[in-house]
Regions:
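Metallocofactor- and cofactor-centric catalytic cores in central/energy metabolism, strongly enriched
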Residues: 1-182
């Protein structure tokens, strides 16, 4: 028999890592980001198509003007108007959407797009102080696809201007939050 666990080092015996800092984006609230992104989150799958088209236009027409922004991403989900929003397990997707809005790589810039008739309303994913015209856009408030698209582009431009001011800085490893997906 070979003994097991005989060479385990206790934490006080671990060597100092060769690197104790990393270059990241400090946020006013929450953990630091590893990238500088504009994230556009939808409240309903019905808004996903418009948002995905808008993201492609933002990448082509706006992003080149903002060299300090790494990219633009659409965060969509499959939940529609018929979702049982008050079901016992509905808190799981609501919590996921709420948390992704606050992703460290988004630099605190909130951009949520809804259709206007969905059950998953802004107040279910944002605190009251963040439900503003600067952060939330309702597609049904605009007449036609072109107006919707322009409204998204205008909001995105304002967010990109703010994100473009962010710079990487040297941060301690203790400020690096790593998420893992297992299984």
């Amino acid at each position: 028999d070979m003994p097991w666990g005989t060479s385990i080092k206790t934490p006080d015996e671990l060597p100092t890592p060769p690197r104790t800092t990393w270059m990241g984006y400090r946020n006013k609230v929450g953990p630091a980001g590893t990238r500088n992104l504009l994230g556009i989150v939808t409240t309903v799958q019905c808004a996903a198509g418009v948002v995905k088209v808008a993201v492609e236009r933002i990448k082509k027409e706006l992003l080149p003007k903002y060299p300090n922004v790494d990219g633009v991403v659409a965060i969509t989900h499959p939940y529609g108007c018929g979702v049982a929003i008050n079901a016992p397990l509905a808190y799981i997707p609501i919590r996921a959407i709420t948390n992704v809005i606050r992703h460290p790589n988004f630099g605190g810039e909130i951009m949520v797009v809804g259709l206007g008739c969905e059950k998953l309303t802004y107040d279910r994913v944002l605190p009251p102080e963040d439900i503003t015209p600067e952060n939330c856009l309702t597609l049904q408030d605009w007449e036609g696809h072109d107006a919707m698209m322009q409204a998204i582009l205008d909001m995105a431009e304002k967010k990109l201007q703010k994100l473009n001011l962010r710079r990487r800085e040297e941060l301690p490893l203790s400020e690096l939050l790593i998420g893992m997906q297992c299984g």
